[in-house]
A protein has these predicted regions:
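A short, well-ordered alpha-helix in the C-terminal region of glycosyltransferases
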Residues: 230, 237-251
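Nucleotide-sugar donor-binding catalytic core of glycosyltransferases
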Residues: 1-217, 251-272
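C-terminal "capping" alpha-helix adjacent to the active site of nucleotide-linked donor transferases
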Residues: 220-237
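Generic signal for short, ordered secondary-structure residues
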Residues: 169-171, 224, 245
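Alpha-helical protein-protein interaction elements
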Residues: 113, 156, 233, 240-241
């Protein structure tokens, strides 16, 4: 039986962390051996861990290099979300996808044509493209579309995860602007899980393994989203993109797929040892 050391749960006052996603991945790791896994925030020193521990490092939206403590000799593999843009020389450090936060209940069972919202956005306000999106949304107030959007100040102060999942489940087009610093944010994989058509930053690190075959539509200027009207005028195109989005999610983000990927990475390390 695998051992999990979870330093995330209860750490954040808003209660949002990736524990459920990581635990679901670990359930799908089958190497024929038992392993120790540790969940940690990127800038927090690890607790005492046994040799070969597999560490999930999160919350480093600045894409920084791992801190020395996360590269200690007892770390077998370091799975790093927000992978450093310049790469990492330590072969134990692997790029890892953002998944979904605990209690996110969104799903892709509703066909695009039956969804009640043409487009939606709900998230924290920042000046990394979201200010332009805010302006565009305000101009679209009377556009005749069914929509729901809102901005709030500070991270983690918006909708509860279950309500947020419900919002994305009934959304056709999910607006996924950059996070505070990074072009990556959890909204992207969460909306993909719901089969939304994704409008995303044009500088996503699509060279990383988990973006292989990514069907999101890249946006350069968040103040000019004429693509929204083009998509809404072509329901078949939207459904086709939705289908490809679900396939990508199931192949690259779903815990079963990521668990299988991680199983192979662990086996490779064992063979090299």
């Amino acid at each position: 039986m695998h051992t999990i050391i979870n330093t995330l749960r209860g750490r954040f006052v808003h209660g949002k962390d990736e524990s459920e996603y990581y635990e679901s991945i670990i359930k799908n790791v089958h190497t024929g051996m038992d392993h120790t896994f540790c969940f940690s925030v990127c800038n927090t020193e690890l607790p005492e861990i046994p040799p070969g521990t597999i560490v999930f490092s999160t919350s480093d939206e600045h894409h920084r290099q791992p801190i020395p403590n996360h590269l200690q000799e007892n770390v077998g593999i370091l799975l790093k979300t927000f992978f450093p843009k310049e790469g990492v020389t330590d072969h134990r450090v692997l790029p890892f996808p953002l998944g979904y936060f605990t209690d996110f209940g969104g799903h892709a069972l509703t066909p695009i044509a039956e969804r009640g919202l043409d487009y939606s956005f709900y998230g924290a306000h920042n000046d990394n493209g979201r200010d332009k999106l805010h302006g565009w949304l305000r101009k679209r107030k009377g556009d005749g579309c069914k929509k729901e959007w809102g901005f709030y100040e500070g991270w983690g102060k918006g909708k509860g995860m279950w309500d947020y999942g419900s919002l994305l489940t009934k959304t056709k087009i999910a607006l996924c602007p950059p996070g505070y610093v990074s072009p990556e944010c959890a909204r992207l994989p969460e909306a993909a899980r719901c089969g939304c058509v994704l409008l995303v930053p044009n500088d996503l690190p699509t060279h990383l393994w988990y973006f292989q075959g990514f069907p999101g539509i890249k946006i350069e200027d968040w103040s000019n989203l004429k693509i929204v009207d083009e998509l809404l005028a072509d329901p078949k195109r939207m459904q086709d993109i939705s289908d490809e989005t679900v396939k990508w999610y199931n192949r690259c983000i779903d815990p079963k797929a990521v668990g299988a990927w991680l199983t192979e990475r662990i086996k490779e390390r064992i063979q090299k040892a």
